[in-house]
Amino acid sequence: MAAVINTNYLSLVAQNNLNKSQSALGSAIERLSSGLRINSAKDDAAGQAIANRFTANVKGLTQAARNANDGISIAQTTEGALNEINNNLQRIRELTVQASNGTNSASDIDSIQQEVNQRLEEINRIAEQTDFNGIKVLKSNATDMTLSIQVGAKDNETIDIKIDRNSNWNLYDAVGTVPGGTVNGEARTVNALGFDVLSAVTTTIASDTVTFDAAVAAAEQAAGAAVGDGSVVSYGDTANPQYAVVVDNAGTMTSYALTFDKDGKAALGDQLGAVASQAAEAAVGTNDVAAGANVTVSGGAADALSKLDDAMKAVDEQRSSLGAIQNRFESTVANLNNTITNLSAARSRIEDSDYATEVSNMTKNQILQQAGTSVLAQANQVPQNVLSLLR
């Protein structure tokens, strides 16, 4: 090697190696202090991109798991409300069976009717007021309600909660006060169709007969009247009857009809043209039947029991659906948590620091720094040897 002064090659080599060990030491300290192997894209460009995608998936799936838990909560809220509706329907059915007993007086029937009315009102209140985060989950709807729960990190990864329209179990929707009715001078409460008629009449639809067990005078008043001159006995406001029958001279019904239009109002009409004018159409008034409820006038407890059985069946079907969707959501949450765990482990292998490796690297580079500094000092002394040639 030539003896030169201007260029100290050995010093340059020592400086270069010292810079490398210093950079490596800084990288090791950064990884140890942050816990991350990749602190910037320059550390591992491909690894950084892969880890970033994993992070997006993990965060999306974590939120999806929370969404699924929200789905469980809304299903539980709805199912709990339906359970209370079912309890009320069970009690109404029990009362209806009690009312069917021939030993009941009119006063007994009225007392039963009062509790039935309150139970029906409570069913409506539960349906109207059951709320989850501002969503009226049981409010009367013309169509089924579907709630889509996002349970994945990608588009269209959803589970639908279907809540059937409640018209099958929401027996009626009454607002305001309900007018009274008069049969043979005795006031009756006209309310939920299928129950009010128990207080005064029994019907047999198949034979088209109506007997007035609590209104004998009404039947007697109709005696002697020809079918064409049929007498009308009505329940409700006398100027606005809500239910009417036409009796002949034997006290049996010749015809009656009560139908619902698309707005849920009731209109009264007669099947016999000869007496149609005497059974003029009239609106229900303040007692509105829920739209689509498919409730027709019933003259006895048997038909009311059928309606109640249909309502309880609808509630049971909806509760079964909600129970099944809860189980599905629980399975979904378990699967999401498992996926999150695996993706997090994969991301960790890419971007997290291995402390054993990094501590070893730090120790090695610290030693190299110390050695490099010492060697650089010696390399800087090499040009001094040229001075001996000048003596």
UniProtKB/Swiss-Prot annotation:
Location of the protein in the cell: Secreted; Bacterial flagellum
Location (main, coarse): secreted
Gene3D superfamilies with a match to the protein in the record: 2.60.40.4390, 6.10.280.190, f41 fragment of flagellin, N-terminal domain (1.20.1330.10), Flagellar export chaperone, C-terminal domain (6.10.10.10)
Pfam families referenced in this protein's UniProt entry, alphabetically: Flagellin_C, Flagellin_N
MF GO annotations: structural molecule activity
Entry keyword set: Bacterial flagellum, Secreted
Domain of life: Bacteria
Listed GO CC annotations: bacterial-type flagellum; extracellular region
Coiled coil stretches, renumbered: none
NCBIfam families: PRK06819.1
Role of this protein: Flagellin is the subunit protein which polymerizes to form the filaments of bacterial flagella.
Family label: Belongs to the bacterial flagellin family.
Protein name (record): Flagellin
